[in-house]
Regions:
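Structural detector of well-ordered beta-strand residues that form the stable sheet scaffold
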Residues: 47, 76, 97, 150-151, ...
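Phosphate-binding glycine-rich loop
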Residues: 23, 28-74, 88-92, 98-99
């Protein structure tokens, strides 16, 4: 089956535009995508980068550079995640604290998170999996109670809507997306 039949011509035209104008990085096409994606997600800014790992590394790096987090601080993260989520944390000298998933959704178990919070905890990284939103109001309440940053890994959940209408990538303090097809 021709999987490109529906959008093949449009994709070829877009690729041709990028290749023929010589701007493979940054440039007008990238700026337009960042603007359009920000509108789609409902955020002020989008920054294009190479991949989801880089996006997450840059988020944690920014918080370290700004002094919001420092090496040795902890980030609660679901045990059921792709390794990039963990690598982004450790790359910045932060310590991942694994939280077991809910057995019925395989997403971070919001009933276990608060028991993992310590004086060194600075953030919760949620991973929206299988097109489902991992965020719950309980997670938001925990972040508020302990003044924690909420980081979203949205590699598997572009455009999912929370019951309050917010879209994945606009729920937390920062979010990383990936367009890798695997």
């Amino acid at each position: 089956k021709d999987v490109t039949a529906l959008h093949g011509a449009e994709i070829n035209e877009a690729v041709s535009r990028v290749v023929n104008n010589g701007w493979y990085l940054q440039g007008a096409e990238n700026e337009k995508f960042e603007k359009d994606y920000s509108e789609f997600v409902g955020t002020k800014h989008t920054i294009g980068c190479a991949n989801g790992l880089d996006a997450l590394i840059w988020i944690f790096r920014a918080y370290v550079e700004l002094g919001v987090m420092k090496p040795g601080d902890e980030v609660i993260v679901p045990a059921n995640t792709y390794i990039a989520t963990i690598l982004a944390i450790t790359e910045n000298g932060l310590v991942p604290v694994l939280c077991e998933p809910k057995p019925n959704t395989l997403e971070i178990d919001d009933d276990r998170i608060e028991g993992l919070v310590t004086s060194k905890t600075k953030a919760i990284a949620i991973v929206h999996l299988y097109g489902r939103i991992a965020y719950t109001d309980k997670i938001g309440d925990i972040c508020k109670k302990y003044n924690l940053k909420l980081i979203e890994d949205c590699a598997q959940s572009h455009g999912c809507r929370h019951t309050d209408g917010r879209v994945t990538g606009s729920i937390g303090d920062a979010a990383g997306h990936s367009f890798y097809p695997g």
